[in-house]
Amino acid sequence: MATVIYPSPIFGPVHSRRLGVSLGINLLPEDGKWCTFDCVYCECGFNKDFRPKKPLPTREEVRTALEERLKGMSSNGPVPDVLTFAGNGEPTLHPHFAEIIEDTRALRDRYFPKAKISVLSNATQIFRPEVFEALRKVDNNILKLDTVDEGYIRRVDRPTGRYEISRVVERLKDFRGKVIIPVSYTHLTLPTICS
């Protein structure tokens, strides 16, 4: 599988099957991956192979770059369907994630009020109150949950710190339905399912 490391802080727009014309917002360094999972299927590669040397983009850098891109798109197109927080790892790790969400909402309302704001996250930071509240304010709060099987999570998602699926599931309930949970599909054989 080819490895993709995204520019920072803004990339695209790209055409997404699920989301439409998507302008990417990468809150992580542009030269590597920073994530609380080390998934075997990650398009950004393994954490150990792509450790960033550059710093995180600042809140101001993100806001300025996003505004410049949105101004350009308002003059020249294309019209974005969605502004998507994704990129080189887990976006909610950024220490100013909540403030950046507020900035993004204000800029979206100014330039493309019909565009949605999406966050693609692995849900490991939803216990931080400021992250939880920020995720409640986006249009598409997309929190990955590959399975509720702890063994599978350890083998495939490979959390880099404390991770208890039962705690995550309980916290997901606190979103009261304002969450999208994509589930991955894995080919299993009958002996695997029965074991």
Regions found by a protein language model. Give the residues of each.
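Short, charged low-complexity linear segments at domain edges
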Residues: 2-27
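Canonical Radical SAM [4Fe-4S] cluster-binding loop centered on the CxxxCxxC motif
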Residues: 18-61
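Hydrophobic faces of well-ordered beta-strands that scaffold small-molecule active sites
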Residues: 23, 117-119, 141-143, 179-181
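Canonical radical SAM enzyme core domain
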Residues: 52-67, 92-137, 145-150, 159-163, ...
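Short Fe-S-cluster ligation motifs
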Residues: 65-84
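A structural motif corresponding to the C-terminal end of an alpha-helix
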Residues: 111, 171-179
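Glycine-rich S-adenosyl-L-methionine
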Residues: 159-174
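Single conserved hydrophobic/aromatic residue that forms the stacking wall/gate
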Residues: 187-195
